[in-house]
Amino acid sequence: MILTKNSNEKKPLKKGLFIVFEGIDGAGKTSILKQLLEVLKEPKLVNKIFLTREPGGKNNNAAEMIREFFLKNLEVFDPLTLAYLYASSRAEHVKKTINPHLEKDHIVISDRFVHSSYIYQGIVQNQSLDVIYQINQQAIGELEIDYVFYFDVNVNNALNRMKNRFDNTNAFDSQNKQFYEKLLKQYPSVFKVYNQPKKIIFIDANKNENEVLCEVKEQLLKIFKEHKYI
């Protein structure tokens, strides 16, 4: 029996809003994230939204150094070692980037966070999810995710996008179709058990990019209004 890794104890209200985009490679979340500041032009949101990504972190030299080191050497590490390396980068990201922005009441939107480790370092590489949880709790402390946007895409669409994109790919992008099918089956269940966000928003990422961008924008504006940012 797997116990839900969430505490029911009441914690002090934190400032800011923490939103995470999750999904397999090729789901399109990174492309959408890069366009958000162009489409979210509400005056009250100026200087309020901070976009970042994992592994690593925007304007975070330590997290980026760790990222660069292990992404260049993925094949040489034991899976458990990789889990620690990802968590080490995440610890730097949380302590030096995410938490400081939340303390300023900013809206932090991250391309990937802890659930990616449960999928990639846990399920895919046959590591205990409880161990992955313990490692990452040291990294993130009491930080909680407010919203997860899960970009749901079928494997064929994801693989086609990866083949057509022009940026450099890492070793995970070269895995076969079965690899990504395994990820798709496990993602939703992981959200329910570990570091459960306050709300999960499913995005149909099989649509064209403009349609997905409009849907994400609409959902985000609803959230910002609910939390009185606009």
Curated annotation (Swiss-Prot):
Which Gene Ontology terms cover its molecular function?
Answer: ATP binding; dTMP kinase activity
User: Which InterPro entries does the entry link to?
Assistant: P-loop_NTPase (IPR027417), Thymidylate_kin-like_dom (IPR039430), Thymidylate_kinase (IPR018094)
Q: Which keywords describe this protein according to UniProt?
A: ATP-binding, Kinase, Nucleotide biosynthesis, Nucleotide-binding, Transferase
| Catalysed reactions, as listed in the record | dTMP + ATP = dTDP + ADP
Q: Could you tell me which Gene3D superfamilies the record lists for this protein? A: P-loop containing nucleotide triphosphate hydrolases
Q: What is its EC number?
A: 2.7.4.9
Kindly report, in one word, the top-level EC class recorded for this enzyme: transferase
> In which residues is ATP bound?
G23, I24, D25, G26, A27, G28, K29, T30
Keyword Transferase part of the UniProt annotation:
yes
Q: Which domain of life is it from?
A: Bacteria
**GO CC field:** cytosol
Cross-referenced Pfam families: Thymidylate_kin
One Gene Ontology term of the biological-process aspect is:
dTTP biosynthetic process
The yes or no answer to whether the keyword Transferase is present is: yes
> Of which family is this protein a member?
Belongs to the thymidylate kinase family.
Q: What is this protein called?
A: Thymidylate kinase
This protein's species is Ureaplasma parvum serovar 3 (strain ATCC 700970)
Query: What does UniProt list as this organism's lineage?
Result: Bacteria, Bacillati, Mycoplasmatota, Mycoplasmoidales, Mycoplasmoidaceae
